[in-house]
Amino acid sequence: MARCRHHSGYLADDEASHSMCSARVQLPKKPLVPEMRPACKPGRVPHPPSTCGSSALQGQRRNKRHPQPFGHFLDFLTESQVLDSLETVVEKATERMAAMKTEAGVPLVEVQDPVEVPSGGRRAHARPSLSTVHRHRVRPTLCTGHPNNYPSSSSSMSNCHSSLMAGCLGSHSRDSDLGAQGSLPPVRDKLLLEKNLKRLLQLEREGKGLSQSCSQRDSLLWDSLGSQTSFQWTQEQPLSWFSGLLGSSSGVPEASEPRPGEQEPIFRKREFNKEIKSLLSQLESLDLPGYCPLREPHRTLNFLADHRLFPALQSVVSQAVDKLRGAHCRDGRPLFPTSLEPTSDLPPLGSEPAKPTNGGQPYASPRPTVSSPKMLQRKRKDRGGSPSMSSAQVATRFKLKSPCSSSRFTKKKPLPSISSKSSMSHFSNRLYEELADFLTQQAASLVIRKYEFEKDLSKQLGFFSFPITHVLRDLSLGLKKVKGSRIHLSSETHRSCLLRKLEESKRARQASRLSTSHCSTETPSVQQEPATHTAQDQATEPCRSLYTNLPASRQLSPLEPKLYMSACTGMGSSPPKSKDMDNEGRDKAEIEDEDEDEFKDEDQDEDKDEDGV
């Protein structure tokens, strides 16, 4: 009877048997923690007794004499409900790791089913959401494997059967095949866990999670947790790990799932898609400029500053200022006297022999200036076949004043006289004319080149800058100032100053004509000397007073030769001697008339005094 109770399959009957049967059969086979074993339900049908022979029972007793400590530890975790707490910890840790993202917004750890291949190129969700896991969460159960795990073969079979019915659906064939492998089976088939995760994801999509039975939810929960903990680091694992895992599984995959040999290209494709996605996210995070100069031409000031066009424009003005500042006479004195010492002299870079002048005397250029090739090309294009602006004349020598070129500049400011003495030779006058003419042509070509450059720039960029001609005009009239090589604009316009400058320039032009006519005469009379000195003094004083009133920095402006051209025009165009004699006669007549008027006034005053007396 005790033997029948022993083979009945009820652990409660074995424990409730009489003491002799219990001492003989049950005591040596008791587990470490018997009070924590879950009792079977009384309504459950027991399994038939084991059909193994006496040799099998002796082998089981032999195994139980030397129990494996790892197997007892797993049994302890299962029976004492420690796995429930471990599952909760793993679940929360997995949720937190899955929620972490990098700075680019990409998940730090991507949990994904490696077996599932989405159709149509769509990627499945990485893992079920937290709400789905909690909805399917019931008390987890652990399938520890085949019979012979526990002291009583019948009770272990019944316990394993109940756990298989509750959580491991469709795994009887695998459990029955594991009887000869030992007391504890190896790790569960990963393919089954992956299938359960796939089913859980499908239930989440279709919304059928609430209609499932309790036993199915138990299996889904445990399998999904096992798959989550095993695949939460798939982003860092190599591809061979998945292929080896799938190759070691003994189960046959479904028809819709790919074969284990096809997993390698699939994972390579997924890695490629991840790289493309990361590259696209990096492109979106780049800081593009706020505007494009080609599409928004009204914001091209930044474009000019970035391409260093402002220094190029400023260098044009600086070169003109340096050239005017470094101009010297033959005797070494500066052409434009100023309180500042010239900082740069123009080096003579070679000159071709000068052609004979109107008087037949050849004159070499003392300090020629060479223009850049670009400037020469622009001059050829602008001035065409003009004899006064040819590249050879501008680049290598000074050109004497001709009536054709003098007619182009009608209203120019007179150049200040180098010396007020009447002993200045005819040679120095010619040199003065040549130098003034050359500098005037250089300034005019610079203005034309700058104006065309601004015109082309306004067409390309779509905005109008300040015309250089207006700036130079304001510089000549004193409305703007040049400090060093930079132009400082002034917002105030003085009309009175403008009129005064124009009147002074007109007087100086008339005085320069008188002084030129006096210098051209070869035999001046004694009576003409006072008048000539007076005319030269009048010509010198307005120029000096006007020149000294201006700031020293404005005296170096590139507009000065353009304004002083009228004086050169008067001095350069030497009239015939007959015309000079006529001018001298007119001057004599005017002087005599003035003397007669003075004598008449004195006589009238004397007569009035006598009458009064």
Curated annotation (Swiss-Prot):
The answer, when asked if Plastid is one of the entry's keywords, is no
What ranges does the record give for the region Disordered, renumbered to this chain?
A: 41-68, 329-395, 509-541, 565-613
Give me the stretches of Polar residues compositional bias: 51-60, 512-539
Q: Which residues carry this modification: Phosphoserine?
A: 386
- Give the record's keywords alphabetically: Coiled coil, Cytoplasm, Cytoskeleton, Phosphoprotein
- What sections of the sequence does the record tag as coiled-coil? 79-104
Superkingdom in the source lineage: Eukaryota
Question: Where is this gene product found?
Answer: Cytoplasm, Cytoskeleton, Microtubule organizing center, Centrosome
Q: Where is the composition biased (Acidic residues)?
A: 590-613
Q: Name one Pfam family in it.
A: DUF4702
Q: What is its main location?
A: cytoplasm
Q: Does the keyword GTP-binding apply?
A: no
Bias (Basic and acidic residues) occurs at 577-589
A cellular component term (GO) from this record? cytoplasm
The protein in question is named Coiled-coil domain-containing protein 116
Originating organism: Homo sapiens
Q: Which gene encodes it?
A: CCDC116
